[in-house]
A protein has these predicted regions:
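A glycine-rich helix N-cap at a beta->alpha junction
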Residues: 64-70, 135-155
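Short secondary-structure boundary segments
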Residues: 78, 123, 149
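Short Asp/Glu-rich motifs
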Residues: 23, 50, 130-131, 138, ...
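Small-aliphatic-rich amphipathic alpha-helix that forms the alpha element of a beta-alpha
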Residues: 31, 74, 89-132
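Residue-level "edge-of-site" marker
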Residues: 44, 124, 143
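A short coil-to-beta-strand element that immediately follows conserved catalytic motifs
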Residues: 41, 117-120, 141
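N-terminal amphipathic, basic helical "cap/leader" segment at the start of enzyme domains
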Residues: 1-72, 79, 83
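Short active-site-adjacent structural elements
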Residues: 84-85, 128-130, 152-155
Length: 155
């Protein structure tokens, strides 16, 4: 328990070592397994590895260096239409944010157990990424998660 909750720190400078496809799949499963409002599948988790896409995420994150340094970025977004089938404002937007945050936290905890480092990035220009990734207007990007290994573990 200590490893997950007390030893975790945000990393901003990662090694170039890639996160394996197997581990990426595990992290996606863990994120999608997170509790959600009404049990409705309203979260999308998109892995980003291309330099071009990472540069746009870097710009949208107010130039947070962890985004460029990490070999893997997850874009966590919520679908207002999906959740809107059951909930309406003033609750809908806050529920989407909560669901994305819980999914992201699940992934962060899993990374910690797997000796993978993370940097949670909540300060983002969502609209910029939404336009870049050509998402519909009811999809809201909530967080980015930079994922990778410590520089000292590079091999």
């Amino acid at each position: 328990m200590e490893k997950v909750f007390f030893e975790r720190k945000s990393f901003r400078e990662f090694s170039e070592k890639k996160v394996s496809s197997e581990l990426q799949d595990i992290l996606l499963k863990v994120g999608y397994a997170a509790p959600r409002s009404g049990g409705i599948p309203c979260i999308t988790i998109t892995p980003i590895t291309s330099d071009k896409d990472k540069k746009m995420c870097y710009k949208a994150s107010f130039y947070q260096k962890a985004v460029l340094s990490a070999p893997l970025i997850y874009v966590i977004s919520g679908d207002l239409d999906m959740l809107g089938k059951k909930y309406k404002e003033p609750y809908l937007t806050s529920f989407i944010i909560q669901n994305a945050a819980v999914a992201t936290m699940n992934m962060i905890n899993a990374c910690q157990l797997l000796n993978i480092e993370t940097c949670y990035i909540g300060g983002i220009r969502s609209e910029m990424l939404q336009k870049y990734f050509e998402m519909n207007e009811t999809t809201k990007i909530i967080t980015l998660l930079a994922v990778g290994y410590k520089r000292s573990e590079e091999g």
